[in-house]
Amino acid sequence: MKKSAWGLVDAFFDKYDLVDHHIHSYNDFVSNRIQEIIDTSEPIELEQGQYTVETGKVTIEKPFIKEADGSKSKIYPTEARLRNLTYSAHMSLEMRLLKEGGSETEFEKVHIGELPVMLKSEICHLHGLGRDELIEKGEDPADLGGYFIVNASERSIVTMEEIAPNKIILERIGEEDEKRARAIVTSIRSGFRARISLEYRKPRKTGVFLRISFPYVPGELPLVILLRALGLATDQEIITSISDDFNYQMIAADDIQVSLDKLKLDSDKMEEEMDEEERREYLIRSAIKYIGNRVAKGMTEDYRIKRAEDVIDRYLLPHIGTEPDKRLEKAVYLAEMTEMLLQVISGERKPHDKDHYTNKRLRVSGDLMEDLFRVAFTSLTRDMSYRLERSLARGKEPSVKQAVRSDVLSENLKHAIATGNWVGGRAGVSQLLDRTSYMGTLSHMRRVVSPLSRSQPHFEARDLHPTQFGKICPNETPESPNCGLVKNLALMAKISEGSDPDEIEEVIKKMGVIN
Amino acid sequence: MRGILKKISQINFGLMSPEDIRKMSVAQIVTPDTYDEDGYPIENELMDPRLGVIGSSLRCRSCGAKGGECPGHFGSINLARPVIHVGFADTIHKILSSICRKCSRILLTETEIQDYRQRILEAMEREESLTPIIKEIYAEARRDRCPHCEEEQEEIKLDKPVSIVEGDYKLTPSEVRERLERITDNDSLLLGVNPEVARPEWMVLTVLPVPPVTVRPSITLETGERSEDDLTHKLVDILRINQRLKENMEAGAPQLIVEDLWELLQYHVTTYFDNEASGVPPARHRSGRPLKTLAQRLKGKEGRFRSNLSGKRVNFSARTVVSPDPNVSVNEVGVPELIAKEVTVPVYVTEWNIDRMKEHIENGPDVHPGANYVIRPDGRKIRAYNETKDVVLENLKPGYIVERHLKDGDIVLFNRQPSLHRMSMMAHEVRVLPYKTFRLNLCVCPPYNADFDGDEMNMHVFQTEESRAEAKTLMRVQDHILSPRFRDLSSGVYTTISQEHTSSQGKRLFSVRSRPPDPQEGRAPPPDREGREWTVKEIFSMVLPDDLNMVYLAEICRKCDECLEMDWENDAYVVIENGQLITGVIDEKAYGAFAGKILDQIVKEYGSDAAKEFLDSATKLAIAGIMHAGFTTSTNDEEIPEEAKERIEAHLRNAEARVDQLIEAYENGELEPLPGRSLEETLEMKIMQVLGEAKDKSGEIAESYFDMDENHAVIMALTGARGAMLNLTQITACVGQQSVHGGRITRGYDNRTLPHFKKGELGAKSRGFVHSSYKEDSILLEFMGGREGLVDTAIRTAQSGYMQRRLVNALQDLTVDENGRVVDNRGVIIQTRFGEDGVDPAKSDYGKIVDLDKLVQEIRLKSGK
């Protein structure tokens, strides 16, 4: 390296720590995302809406402990380590119980639980302390923080690598001349992940080429029927929105032909009795009915239709939106996805390289805490509504303060971090911080784990990919069966926290981008 | 119970009939409870004292034996309604599909029945496998109409795990049983059920055997709480439901309720047999842990078969860390005194050894060559405590057995896992040594694949004279110097000898006074010889047998077109005449791990003990030599002059230019495709070829600047001691092309590997040709090749283990019989001669019956020409 470049390196490390990604991500979690989760969580309703619990602002205090004699004092990490305590912060939430037709009541501040605190984060006592102050508090001044202390054991949350969500990934199945391919989108909306998979495959005897599967629908659906159910009523609409290319249009047209009788259309009635608007309505309805038969077989027709609509609104591409008026948008998205898939089949477009780092996202401690907190908070609200209902049933005056069991939330968070068993059944998310050596600690804090299974070969995924240049260390990986699946961030790599898509959209529009 | 001996003459495999179960049952189990208030077992429940007892205080009500001696006795449960046995659900389904739904005759015509019957009886006569015939019958017996009663047949499906559905109607186990009952004995034989040992309807259970308590012991926790075995829990469930079903049926409950309970009983019986059957939710313990029922006890790695029957824990074994010791012979193992005092050898006391044995007992269990136990002829075991040993000594007479400590010269079995081949377990002689590690000679590391970074090994002490004798004849280390795979054991020691030779050219003098190279007395060289000191070659000759004659080319031989033989300056032409090394160096070819010529010769001509002696003394000589001369290497050994660097640089530039020319030709369409290849493949191949040559050439240039006499790294590479020339040239000259999945690197960004290349660029650099050396800069693409190697080794170790297991399972029963044929356990001949030629690769010359070249050479040497 040229001598002058070292100056840049020094300047970089003057400004950034090696564990910045954890600390920034956790700060973002504490200051924005907790509030967001609470605001967007489903409100508690009791007795068919007679009572509702409204939530307000959440406040998080810096860590302190209540001793057995009732005295309160600040707690520093060292004390937590020595006394087998958890370094955690008090969370309180403004809540009030509204009775239908009742008067407005004041917000009450309720202690909802303890949040394990990441060392050196904004809510940590060590935040912003100087060298001498750190030594005075019993800390190693060179320690970078970024981990938690739960029951006196130091636990770091390992960064998880995942395939980029809300992005179409095209992949070929088998060899090129097998003519099979799949387009996958992992659509994420507030913690709910829906995997939508569109596959092009030659049907065994008769049937459609393009099939789609998504959560809560057993098996696969013909794509064209789904598009119709989403509001592309006529054949022409479906075909033209998929592609302008005649060849691709023909594939879609074939599928429409094949799947037509599944809709059980009454063509005479359509021709004679309906005007164009009615016909459109009729076509969409029959497509929805078909889906209804699949998702709620054996139920009443009304329920089937309701359920079908519910499923396509909530579980199909939820990142676009979950309201019924987003259906057309989803249809367009799917149509575009279809064209891309067909291009892969014809060889016009290359399938995506799954290991390309553009198709990967890293989930840092804040993101993982978000998942955890969302589930823990839901179980708190569930517990609350159970207790409120019980006190109502006993004829007592319900009280929010008494209904909250702060242990529910605290224990959920603590237990997950202490054992590494995260929500969604993932194990080993938090690990005992490696203190073999200072470098071991640093390396552990920058570790990136891929969720691919260790037992399968996955040769491609284990290889060093040139796009990891500058982001992932090319050298550091274990020699165990985890080889290439456990990685480490490059020394000078930073992880951004992500920003509000609306804000970005605005900026882009301001820069002159139309549509 | 004791003393009843019976010889097993044959074993029948069949099904247990309900009568069989009742006959062997000593108790009818009815109540689901286990103990009364006082904690005593009640009659007719799962802990019925007639089922046997655990704990020595009680006596079994059936056989009168005490706990621990009573083997236990089966009980039985009368099921209120029959249930299907999960293990036979598939078979039942198959049978039902092949018999008529009305008359239960097999769906074959009379003539077919006659024909198949004939074939089956014939096959049974000849003791052949019936499987193919039965398979054929099942395939044939699918008819839409019964040939016997003309009944229309419906399709029968198996709804996993145990529901049998005919058309849309689910058959109850009773109906299934009825159908199976109607099958005639004749038909049953055709369906693969031998009526002599089993009836098809026995696959539907009406009586459930209850295993004895010894099979499902309950444990008492410290708190005094009793904790029952999983099987007992499951049996309680079965009994409870059975009881309810019975009551409901007697009370005339509605059909629906009875069916529900029946279904539940079926579920419990199913999970009692197999709690991992597909299609049923596993029965769980209160804590949420799935119960471990019968199938789980047997299945898999932790199951009875693989864990307790194929593999067992043993006594008289030891395990500790291994460390090297050159002063231990190849066929020895250094055993820590601590271990030697713990694991013992049983010795029969005779008139001739009674005094020695007394000495052992006198030493007691804590002083090393002592004894731990004395076994009296009546089988009583007495510990030889310091306090009791006087009494023991007094009584000791021939016929007693003394379990004495391990001492020098005992034969033990030494093993390192994974035991991949027979050399992973070899018999060693004990050397009791201080400290706490097993010590082994460096030359036995390769067959065990051991190193000393924390490896642990196991030692087993033989407990019978027969085993000791068998090990001595078959398993000793020296008998495995030549093995089917490893040509011989040692590695790594030859460097020194060869190095001394190359540098001395037989002229430099090398005196060994402090340590005689040969431990054998009388062969130690006198300090002075004819007024001059010894040459290295003369010293080495001391470890060779006196009448050894051989000629071969050493590893350092450059394979010149015309061999200069003895005149070549590097001394690669090895001549040994009458045990004297005349010319040549001693390197890997002499006694390396795969190639050792001298060692090979000695094993074959003089036997394995001589080979052991040779190996030991040569190793000691080498160590003495290396202690004398010193041998080290540093990065300076990989330094080449500026001039060489320039030459290499020019050469690589030239090669890259040629690659560019090839690409240009390809782009202009001037490239001719090679036969059978596409244009792209041709280009790739040509580029690879050019770059490969370039790397080799640059290596050659670097090599030509290396000094063969003084450069230790080069000496190691050339003699084959450690490292290869390729490693050295990669360090000095050029790393070369990195390959991933067998080709140049293509993955990466869109149409290029890295963003600082042009899109679509095919040149050497952009596809992973590393121009620089390891000493210079490294680039990202270099890591890609490295990662692939790492992944490969990681995956391979995991996969090869499983492959090994499969291979062993497939081949373990093959043996070579006294006629030289390879036979399996049934006596079926696999090969008429072992390996088709009858040659033992370990005892032949490189797998051939005769090595003509060697013979000719020998004769020539012997005739003095």
From Swiss-Prot, chain A:
InterPro entries: DNA-dir_RNA_pol_su2 (IPR015712), RNA_pol_bsu_protrusion (IPR007644), RNA_pol_Rpb2_2 (IPR007642), RNA_pol_Rpb2_2_sf (IPR037034), RNA_pol_Rpb2_3 (IPR007645). Its main location: cytoplasm. It catalyses: RNA(n) + a ribonucleoside 5'-triphosphate = RNA(n+1) + diphosphate. GO terms for biological process: DNA-templated transcription. It holds the Pfam family RNA_pol_Rpb2_3. Keywords: Cytoplasm, DNA-binding, DNA-directed RNA polymerase, Nucleotidyltransferase, Transcription, Transferase. It is found in: Cytoplasm. Its EC number is 2.7.7.6. Part of the RNA polymerase complex. DNA-dependent RNA polymerase (RNAP) catalyzes the transcription of DNA into RNA using the four ribonucleoside triphosphates as substrates. The Rpo2 subunit (Rpo2N and Rpo2C in this organism) is implicated in DNA promoter recognition and in nucleotide binding. Belongs to the RNA polymerase beta chain family. PANTHER family: DNA-DIRECTED RNA POLYMERASE I SUBUNIT 2. This is DNA-directed RNA polymerase subunit Rpo2N.
Curated annotation (Swiss-Prot), chain B:
Zn(2+) 2 binds at residues 100, 103, 146, 149. Residues 515-531 have a biased composition (Basic and acidic residues). Residues 500-531 are annotated as: Disordered. It comes from Methanothermobacter thermautotrophicus (strain Winter) (Methanobacterium thermoautotrophicum). Keywords: Cytoplasm, DNA-binding, DNA-directed RNA polymerase, Magnesium, Metal-binding, Nucleotidyltransferase, Transcription, Transferase, Zinc. CDD domains: RNAP_archeal_A (cd02582). The gene is rpo1N. Its cofactor is Mg(2+); Zn(2+). GO terms for molecular function: DNA binding; DNA-directed RNA polymerase activity; magnesium ion binding; zinc ion binding. The keyword Nucleotidyltransferase applies. This is DNA-directed RNA polymerase subunit Rpo1N. It is an enzyme of class 2 (transferase). GO terms for cellular component: cytoplasm; DNA-directed RNA polymerase complex. Zn(2+) 1 binds at residues 60, 63, 70, 73. NCBIfam families: PRK08566.1 (NF006336), RNA_pol_rpoA1 (TIGR02390). DNA-dependent RNA polymerase (RNAP) catalyzes the transcription of DNA into RNA using the four ribonucleoside triphosphates as substrates. Forms the clamp head domain. Mg(2+) binds at residues 451, 453, 455. Part of the RNA polymerase complex. GO terms for biological process: DNA-templated transcription.
